[in-house]
């Protein structure tokens, strides 16, 4: 029975120890390689030294880091803050450089206009099909088939700087750009179209639109992830070849429809970015085919300025020829082969639903008529002028359509009133500048909508913003989240921090993500180095950014880009201080591994330290962060309260604290309290005594009249000796006495104090005498329990000692037996080897003996 009780007790103790050991607590790790999607402003860097690049971008120094991550990450070219910022910023660049005329209506005056009824120059009604591949005539300004546009010559008078004088001006307009009172006759009164919605805010000087190359960079504390998978299509599948970078690649500022020009993503293959939910696509063309486009606006025209007031000008262009705004673009390269490869690539795409074996069912198609000009025609910008090109002949040429005109060039015209490509609205620009305009571009991509079915149509699109989905769609912006939670069996970190001599371990900021693909256990071993790398990388990037800002004094103008760059300087420090403030609120400031007393909330959710990365673990427990953070803050508040109470107790442990000046002030305060209490008690006692004497019929001592200063005569009994008079005899009917009341009163107070202290002593003695019998059984029971526990521990220690001795003897016996066995086996083996050796040595002797016997 006793043995079963011992076994039960041992089982309970072991179970308790197991439960205590298996209890999981929240552990805070600082410096883990994890991240989450972010949407903060990026800053740009460029090598262009034009006005916009100098003011609004930092100089590019080509000093950027990249590291490969062993992780799998999801990318989306459309739901992407990097591409959205690129679209917004390039739009601001376009508006800043081209400077549309807005505010203050420029030409809202009546104009006397003459309509020019024009026809096609060199147009023939023959049905013969002409295929033109030679562009020499286009370069020589003798293109046949280009029509003269319907123009309206207008004359109007306006006042300039001299307000009392009017001046006559001549301007040529497209018929669609003006509104006339009488549209049937050749002479009519006309007004500029959109007169009420277009106004001027600044000088409408002509500006060149020179494309610039720039890159985006992430602020310190953030990073850019890039997908290097060749099968990535802009939305899926998840990317397994991920690279972390501080900046993007260089990209070109593109503004066009239908085609993308001078892109940086062109490779020796054709690939397609396809939106995950609709038919929007961006097709990157193979640069092997050398696809180029050359545009030209010939002519030498005179441009006269109209000055409204100081600083405001509008340029007027007299009509000199019949095609003042005519231009054309011709295409060179292996276009037909490139378009055929596009069809073949589309047929192999996983999203394609048509017949994969028949590419002849895939056709290139122009958008329907009746849409905005930017949709109907290919719109591009050439040196600040907006060209609208009719691509019908070009599509006939690349598709080899029989029965229709096929030419490798397209007629274009320059417009002043254009639709904005990023926001809904219209902008008014100045008439074309004088002189010849030429621009050359490399065609690198196609913007299209794909309608798959029995007949698959690749319809060219006017979504100019799609160009940046291709340029930056393989990037994503992430925020480094170095703080992580995980359950461990350690409840509290109480050991002193040991400082070891370590070498400097700085990999730069991106080196912090170097262990992103490692298991949690392996990454946790380098948290100290990781946290130092994080801070060192932040400081390094801050210093680099500060240096380039100092070199760029134009940043003080605080333009849109300048504000972003200045904001990027403080983002990382704010992030680092925020992380440290959060760690401090949990009691984990400046610790890489911080054990807490907060229990882990979900026992079924535990990390796989050997196979799971920190990024995977953070994605699983991200929904618990708010609750864990609140619990850690509450635990830290309670810990601070406990530490405060403990420090109050510790102040009494050191004897020198008793002699401290502040302690003596406190002692004096306590003494004053005691004196005040005694005085108050004495007053109460005196009042009680006075009332008792009044009840006996005597007046109190202090009620004597002032005339009785020396003594009070009291009759007393003659037979009673004076030495036996006591306070109790006062009030007796016999005799009278003399009582010097001041001295007697002091004696009376002393007797009362002695009686009070004696009473308190008696009460305490009685209380202790009554408590002692009550506490004695409790102490005896506690002593018996401690004795039993001591005996039980001695018994278990004896059992453990006996077991250890038995195991030791068993090991000794095993070692002795093994030694003897090995020794015997060695001796037997040695004897066998000796016999074999003697036999081998005896072979010649046996042979000789055999030969002798044979000879005998």
UniProtKB/Swiss-Prot annotation:
Task: Give GO MF terms, alphabetically.
Answer: structural molecule activity
Q: Which residues form a coiled coil?
A: 615-636
Q: Which residues lie on this side of the membrane: Extracellular?
A: 23-670
Q: Where is this region: V5?
A: 455-460
- Where's the motif Di-leucine internalization motif? 855-856
* InterPro entries listed in its UniProt record: Gp120_core_sf (IPR036377), GP41-like (IPR000328), HIV1_Gp120 (IPR000777)
What intrachain disulfides are recorded? 44-57, 101-204, 108-195, 113-154, 217-247, 227-239, 295-329, 382-439, 389-412
Pfam families this protein is in? GP120, GP41
Modifications made to the protein after synthesis: Specific enzymatic cleavages in vivo yield mature proteins. Envelope glycoproteins are synthesized as an inactive precursor that is heavily N-glycosylated and processed likely by host cell furin in the Golgi to yield the mature SU and TM proteins. The cleavage site between SU and TM requires the minimal sequence [KR]-X-[KR]-R. Palmitoylation of the transmembrane protein and of Env polyprotein (prior to its proteolytic cleavage) is essential for their association with host cell membrane lipid rafts. Palmitoylation is therefore required for envelope trafficking to classical lipid rafts, but not for viral replication.
Q: Where is this region: Fusion peptide?
A: 503-523
Q: Where is this region: V4?
A: 389-412
Q: Where do the record's glycosylation annotations fall on this chain?
A: 37, 70, 79, 112, 116, 128, 133, 142, 182-183, 196, 228, 231, 238, 262, 268, 279, 290, 300, 355, 390, 400, 440, 457, 602, 611, 627
Q: Does the keyword GTP-binding apply?
A: no
Segments of this protein annotated with the region Immunosuppression: 566-582
The record places the following residue ranges in the Cytoplasmic compartment, namely 692-856
Superkingdom of the source? Viruses
- Region listing for MPER, in residue ranges: 648-669
- Miscellaneous comment in the UniProt entry for this protein: Some HIV-2 isolates have been described that can infect cells independently of CD4, using CXCR4 as primary receptor. These isolates may have an exposed coreceptor binding site.
**What is the documented function of this protein?**
The surface protein gp120 (SU) attaches the virus to the host lymphoid cell by binding to the primary receptor CD4. This interaction induces a structural rearrangement creating a high affinity binding site for a chemokine coreceptor like CXCR4 and/or CCR5. This peculiar 2 stage receptor-interaction strategy allows gp120 to maintain the highly conserved coreceptor-binding site in a cryptic conformation, protected from neutralizing antibodies. Since CD4 also displays a binding site for the disulfide-isomerase P4HB/PDI, a P4HB/PDI-CD4-CXCR4-gp120 complex may form.
Q: What is this protein called?
A: Envelope glycoprotein gp160
């Amino acid at each position: 029975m006793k043995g079963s009780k011992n076994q039960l007790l041992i089982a309970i103790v072991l179970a308790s120890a197991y439960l205590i050991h298996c209890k999981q607590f929240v552990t805070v790790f600082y410096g883990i390689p994890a991240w989450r999607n972010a949407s903060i402003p990026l800053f740009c860097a460029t090598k262009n030294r034009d006005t916009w690049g100098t003011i609004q971008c930092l100089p590019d120094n080509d000093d950027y880091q990249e590291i490969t991550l062993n992780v799998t990450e999801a990318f989306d070219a459309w739901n992407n803050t990097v591409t959205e910022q690129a679209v917004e910023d390039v739009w601001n660049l376009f508006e800043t450089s081209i400077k549309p005329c807005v505010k203050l209506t420029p030409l809202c005056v009546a104009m006397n206009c003459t309509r020019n009824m024009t026809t096609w120059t060199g147009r023939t009604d023959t049905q013969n099909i002409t295929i033109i591949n030679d562009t020499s005539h286009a370069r020589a300004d003798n293109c046949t088939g280009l029509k003269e546009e319907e123009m309206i010559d207008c004359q109007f008078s306006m006042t300039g700087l001299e307000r009392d004088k009017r001046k006559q001006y001549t301007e040529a307009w497209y018929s669609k750009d003006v509104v006339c009172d009488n549209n049937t006759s050749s002479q009519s009164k006309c007004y500029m179209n959109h007169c009420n919605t277009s106004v001027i805010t600044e000088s409408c000087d002509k500006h060149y639109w020179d494309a610039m190359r720039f890159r985006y960079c992430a602020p310190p504390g953030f990073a850019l992830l890039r997908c290097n998978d060749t099968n990535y299509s802009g939305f899926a599948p998840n990317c397994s070849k991920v690279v972390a970078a501080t900046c993007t690649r260089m990209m070109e500022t593109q503004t066009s429809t239908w085609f993308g020009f001078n892109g940086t993503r062109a490779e020796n293959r054709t690939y397609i970015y396809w939106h995950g939910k609709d038919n929007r696509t961006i097709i990157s063309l193979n640069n092997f085919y050398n696809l180029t486009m050359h545009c030209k606006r010939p002519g030498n025209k005179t441009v006269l300025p109209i000055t409204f007031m100081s600083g405001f000008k509008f340029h007027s262009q007299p009509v000199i020829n019949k095609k003042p705004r005519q231009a054309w673009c011709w295409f060179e390269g292996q276009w037909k082969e490139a378009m055929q490869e596009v069809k073949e690539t589309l047929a192999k795409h996983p999203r394609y639903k048509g017949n994969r074996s028949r590419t002849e069912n895939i056709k290139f198609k122009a958008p329907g008529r009746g849409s905005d000009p930017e949709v109907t025609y290919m719109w591009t910008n050439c040196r600040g002028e907006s060209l609208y090109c009719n691509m019908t002949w070009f599509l006939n040429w690349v598709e080899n359509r029989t029965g229709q005109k096929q030419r490798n060039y397209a007629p274009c015209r320059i417009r002043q009133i254009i639709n904005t490509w990023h926001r809904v609205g219209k902008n008014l620009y100045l008439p074309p500048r004088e002189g010849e305009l030429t621009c050359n571009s490399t065609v690198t991509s196609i913007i299209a909508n794909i309608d798959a079915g029995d007949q698959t149509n690749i319809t060219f699109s006017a979504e100019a913003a799609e160009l940046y989905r291709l340029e930056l769609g393989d990037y994503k912006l992430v925020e480094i989240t170095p703080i992580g939670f995980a359950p461990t069996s350690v409840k509290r970190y109480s050991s002193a921090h040991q400082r070891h001599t370590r070498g400097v371990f700085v990999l730069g900021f991106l080196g912090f993500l170097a262990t992103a693909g490692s298991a949690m256990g392996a990454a946790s071993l380098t948290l100290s180095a990781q946290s130092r790398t994080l801070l060192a990388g932040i400081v390094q990037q801050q210093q680099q950014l500060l240096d380039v800002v100092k070199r760029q004094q134009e940043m003080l103008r605080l333009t849109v880009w300048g504000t972003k760059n200045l904001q990027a300087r403080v983002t990382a420090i704010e992030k680092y201080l925020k992380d440290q403030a959060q760690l401090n609120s949990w009691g984990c400031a400046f610790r890489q591994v911080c054990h807490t007393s907060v229990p882990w909330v979900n026992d079924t959710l535990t990390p796989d330290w050997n196979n799971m990365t920190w990024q995977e673990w953070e994605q699983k427990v991200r929904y618990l962060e708010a609750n864990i953070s609140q619990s850690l803050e509450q635990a830290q508040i309670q810990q601070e309260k406990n530490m405060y109470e403990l420090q109050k107790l510790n102040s009494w442990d050191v004897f020198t604290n008793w002699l401290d000046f502040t302690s003596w002030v406190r002692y004096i305060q306590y003494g004053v309290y005691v004196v005040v209490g005694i005085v108050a008690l004495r007053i109460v006692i005196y009042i009680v005594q006075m009332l008792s004497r009044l009840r006996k019929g005597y007046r109190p001592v202090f009620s004597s009249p002032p005339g009785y200063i020396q003594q009070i005569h009291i009759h007393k009994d003659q037979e009673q000796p004076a030495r036996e008079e006591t306070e109790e005899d006062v009030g007796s009917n016999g005799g009278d006495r003399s009582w010097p009341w001041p001295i007697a009163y002091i004696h009376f107070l002393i007797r009362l104090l002695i009686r009070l202290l004696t009473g308190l002593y008696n009460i305490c003695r009685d209380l202790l005498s009554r408590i002692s019998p009550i506490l004695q059984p409790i102490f005896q029971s506690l002593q018996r329990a401690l004795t039993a526990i001591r005996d039980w521990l001695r018994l278990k220690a004896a059992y453990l000692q006996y077991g250890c001795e038995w195991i030791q003897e068993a090991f000794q016996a095993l070692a002795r037996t093994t030694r003897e066995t090995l020794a015997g086996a060695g001796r037997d083996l040695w004897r066998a080897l000796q016999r074999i050796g003697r036999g081998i040595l005896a072979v010649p002797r046996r042979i000789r003996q055999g030969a002798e016997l044979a000879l005998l």
